[in-house]
Amino acid sequence: IKDDTARFEHMDWRNIVYLVGYYKEGRIIPAAPPILTTEMAKHTISARPNMQKKNKMRLERKYTEAPIIIFLRDLLLDGRFQGSNSPDFKNTIDMHVITQRPPGSYLTVKLDTVYKFRYVRFLARDGIRSDISEVEFYSPSDSVNPLKGIPMGNPPVDGDNSHRMEMAFDGDPLTCYASANLNNAWVGLDFGKKTEINKIRFAPRGDDNSVREGDEYELKYLSMDGWVSLGRQTARTYFLEFSGGPDKALYLLSNLTRGREERPFTYENDTQVWW
């Protein structure tokens, strides 16, 4: 420190967020806005909250999404949720077809028709293994608890029991089913009798860092006095909506129910930009 200026040398410049601060009464107080360093010629980006302009934000994740996670979501495209009253799935009916990249967390699909089947399944498109984390079917009489049945489908990839068909119905989004087949790859349930179905809920294979329905979250932004809370919300679907956050601020979304991974971000052009 010299002439009221602090100089830091031998710093790593590879996409790292730095915050210069000082201790006061047991807290770290920012001495300057946070800085993101990039690999491009030691370029820096600073986050300075603009309190005169407020954002309405739609948030889907609390941590950056790796390319493999996006790839796993895309594996479900053109997948079909089918029903039949024959164990070999003759005369199947498509209850739902995945036509858009699904979110990283659970997606609920309310069916236009009440179907009645004994056998149901998720069938991946040809040439793709049936990698999926969770599959749930619901009846009109119980919208909370998924229907129970005997798992059925292809054997797991490489005979790996950690990816066996039961994993698609265990209620844990961090486990998954992965089929050995690359064609006609599927996993399903035998209900034991014809059963009414009016809702499907499923989750792609992922890292559980997407917004999860039923979990409580808190959004904060970094001010010159430290982190400021914008409130808490319990997720009702795979995204959260917050209003009143200052433009150009550095944000942090925390899951108060489970998980520890989180990463700061700015909100630009209606998108979370990870730091």
Task: Label each PLM-derived region with a short phrase.
Residues 2-10, 234-239:
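Short, solvent-exposed S/T- and G/P-enriched segments that are highly enriched in secreted/extracellular
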Residues 13-16, 249:
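A glycine-anchored, Pro-Gly-centered beta-turn/N-cap motif
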Residues 22-34, 39-92, 101-240, 244-275:
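Aromatic, loop-rich ligand-recognition surfaces of beta-strand-rich domains
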